[in-house]
Amino acid sequence: MEVFMFPTGTTVIISVLSVLLAVIPWYLLNKLWLKPKRFEKLLKAQGFQGEPYNLSVLKDKSKQNYMLKLQQEDKSKSIGLSKEAAPSIFTPVHQTVRKYGNNSFLWEGTTPRVIITDPDQIKDVFNKIDDFPKPKLRSIAKYLSVGILDHEGKKWAKHRKIANPAFHLEKLKVMLPAFSHSCNEMISKWKELLSSDGTCEIDVWPSLQNFTCDVISRTAFGSSYAEGTKLFQLLKKQGFLLMTGRHTNNPLWGLLATTTKTKMKEIDREIHDSLEGIIEKREKALKNGETTNDDLLGILLQSNHAEKQGQGNSKNIGMTTQDVIDECKLFYLAGQETTSSLLVWTMVLLGRYPEWQARAREEVLQVFGNQNPNNEGLSQLKIVTMILYEVLRLFPPLIYFNRALRKDLKLGNLLLPEGTQISLPILLIHQDHDLWGDDAKEFKPERFAEGIAKATKGQVSYFPFGWGPRICLGQNFALLEAKIAVSLLLQNFSFELSPNYVHVPTTVLTLQPKNGASIILHKL
């Protein structure tokens, strides 16, 4: 009689191992060699050029190594203001474009990053938000997840709708006194540093960071201002740890117990608990029928409450507490970083080009005299606006936008395979001679005398705040804050670049002066 024998545990294990030993080599071969080479062949067939793929790119940490090198380099090594900023900021992209031209690509591990510089193709990328989503956050970058910036599809649309009222111009007008108050406090501190002849030399960068932190703390949290300031310091620490973390893009990060990861977890928990406490107090007051504050958080919670009421309080409608926490992070990271970057480069360039500083001051005094700026007058500042636009062209807060393809797609006449990443190098496009003329790298605010559309000839070649449906919600906030700050500074001081100023633009979360910004102030 034949007896059926069930496989023993050992037999099962051997069978599983045999399958794995057969599958894993093929998986690795495809992932590490065959698939990247197919990408390369397809891209080169369409006229793209780049370094040939080889296994050495898996060890290539050029971006991380560059960041570390930049942190350690001698501060006396200066980059002249007349030179483009790109080589010192994002060397891999710049060097790729310089070597292979605009139609080029580079490798990030096994993933090709295609560099797109054609305005029509850029327009398509920005407009077709479902086809060209942002890359998914990996590893510790999740600790700086900033709300609506990271969302896609229906969740993005819902959050955009709820957050939008907080940034309407009518709401922002109410916040203008807070902008002026914070800036006047900074100016008062600077005046205390003046010598008997009414001058002093100061690194304005830390002061401008504190000013924009002060503004966002007041306008985002109102009466919770002190808590807001503490949150800013915590988020600043998170940003520093993220940018200096060696394993940020390592998919195995979650399995690694590292000091940086542990610190980021601790800070994230502290941020979460602080924001949760602020939000719960506000929501309780809202439910009790108390008047909401006219700060960003109050308007956001009111809008969220209205959305839930309109949909029958469904749990799937509106923002959760965690969603609101993420949006509060965005208030800080986007609101503070963007404006401080814009202001410091504005002072640097106006310090270098005194004729434009004089023209801007004349305009400010003509519109406001020695009074605090008001909303009606801000709309009349044509020269100041031209200057700010030109500063954003030469020194945009972000130096590139990335997008990821989750399916094969056509972009103009290009066929891009699933898995490809797209890079829109803002800095290079803003200084492209073909798009902006032979004076593309020069500071010439007059190019914006008739507005952005005229300066760009209707092309998508200028996008410091993004473009299309996902354009930055806070751009009006940032520009109003910058106009008020520039106006108040010009009313109180003339200023020039110090001989001690060393021009080394670098990117942390935004484009910043690595060695600070030494400015000589003269009291007016």
From Swiss-Prot:
CDD domains from the UniProt entry: CYP72
Topology relative to the membrane: Single-pass membrane protein
Domain of life assignment: Eukaryota
Pfam families: p450 (PF00067)
Cofactor(s) the protein requires to work: heme
Tissue specificity note: Expressed in flowers. Detected in roots upon salt treatment.
Induction: Up-regulated in roots by salt treatment.
Membrane-traversing stretches: 9-29
Reaction(s) this enzyme catalyzes, per UniProt: 11-oxo-beta-amyrin + 3 reduced [NADPH--hemoprotein reductase] + 3 O2 = glycyrrhetinate + 3 oxidized [NADPH--hemoprotein reductase] + 4 H2O + 4 H(+)
Location of the protein in the cell: Membrane
Biological role stated in the UniProt entry: Involved in the biosynthesis of triterpenoid saponins.
Protein name as it appears in the record: 11-oxo-beta-amyrin 30-oxidase
Organism listed in the record: Medicago truncatula
Gene it is expressed from: CYP72A63
